[in-house]
């Protein structure tokens, strides 16, 4: 079996890691051994946070809807229940966007929800 010289593959692997670690602080962007750890950890955080991002945005939408609903004299849960009873199918993302950018339309939705609750 012939000898395998690994210079080319090792250099390529090092370059890939160092490119990914570009912009990191101190040794994390300069020392391969430390950069490998930093890049691996960054990947773990990215994987975790891609899932958390979905939860956090939903929380934000609900907080915005709740605030706008309370300004119109209704709690979030009663608003959602009223919209369901009025068979208005609108998701929380769009509902929060309406609450922030179009107060009149949101007020109209709240009134329909209130009417459906009675």
UniProtKB/Swiss-Prot annotation:
- One GO CC term on file: ribonucleoprotein complex
For this protein, the record's PROSITE patterns field holds: RIBOSOMAL_L20
Q: Which Pfam families match?
A: Ribosomal_L20
Q: Which SUPFAM superfamilies match?
A: Ribosomal protein L20 (SSF74731)
Alphabetically sorted, this entry's keywords are: Ribonucleoprotein, Ribosomal protein, RNA-binding, rRNA-binding
**Which cysteines link up through disulfide bonds?**
none
Q: Which InterPro entries match?
A: Ribosomal_bL20 (IPR005813), RIBOSOMAL_L20_CS (IPR049946), Ribosomal_protein_bL20_C (IPR035566)
What superkingdom heads the lineage? Bacteria
Residue intervals passing through the bilayer: none
**GO BP term, example:** translation
Q: Which GO molecular-function terms appear in the entry?
A: rRNA binding; structural constituent of ribosome
What is known about what this protein does?
Binds directly to 23S ribosomal RNA and is necessary for the in vitro assembly process of the 50S ribosomal subunit. It is not involved in the protein synthesizing functions of that subunit.
Sequence similarity: Belongs to the bacterial ribosomal protein bL20 family.
PANTHER family xref list: 39S RIBOSOMAL PROTEIN L20 (PTHR10986)
- Protein name per the record: Large ribosomal subunit protein bL20
Question: Source species, please?
Answer: Aeromonas hydrophila subsp. hydrophila (strain ATCC 7966 / DSM 30187 / BCRC 13018 / CCUG 14551 / JCM 1027 / KCTC 2358 / NCIMB 9240 / NCTC 8049)
What gene, per UniProt, encodes this protein? rplT
């Amino acid at each position: 079996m012939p000898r395998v010289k690994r210079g080319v593959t090792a250099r390529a692997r090092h370059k890939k890691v160092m490119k990914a670690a570009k912009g990191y602080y101190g040794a994390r962007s300069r020392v391969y051994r430390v950069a490998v750890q930093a890049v691996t950890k960054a990947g773990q955080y990215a994987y975790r946070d891609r899932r958390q991002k979905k939860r956090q945005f939903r929380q934000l939408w609900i907080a915005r809807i709740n605030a706008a609903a309370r300004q119109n004299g209704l709690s979030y849960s009663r608003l959602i229940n009223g919209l369901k009873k009025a068979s208005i199918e609108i998701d929380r993302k769009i509902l929060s966007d309406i609450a922030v950018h179009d107060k009149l339309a949101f007020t109209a939705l709240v009134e329909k929800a209130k009417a459906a609750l009675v």
